[in-house]
């Protein structure tokens, strides 16, 4: 790469950095009016129990602007040790909706684990539609999420 191209690339990257930093600092979470995520369901249970399990308020963790309830102290401790592993993708919004550039509510019974990530869907039928092209829809959702964060995040 020529020195001129290198300098131009550095200038462009430097100018773009505030845009990325602003988006990165924004959050967009699917919470109830009290700040509770996943309708009060235990995020760890989706992985360990392979089903939605209602959390208990006595086992709660506040993380990244959301309140999570857990079914047990063990689940709470697992979450605290690695919250990124257990928090739902796309702020807890419907993954298929995000792939269509929309923020849509979820049905916890329509969850799925894809590549170790918790995806929530609007319904089991929507989950089936998402799974017709899981990789493609996930790529679209990842791409759209940045724009949704920028437009609707706080």
Language-model segments: which ranges?
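N-terminal secretory signal peptides that target proteins for export/translocation
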Residues: 1-3
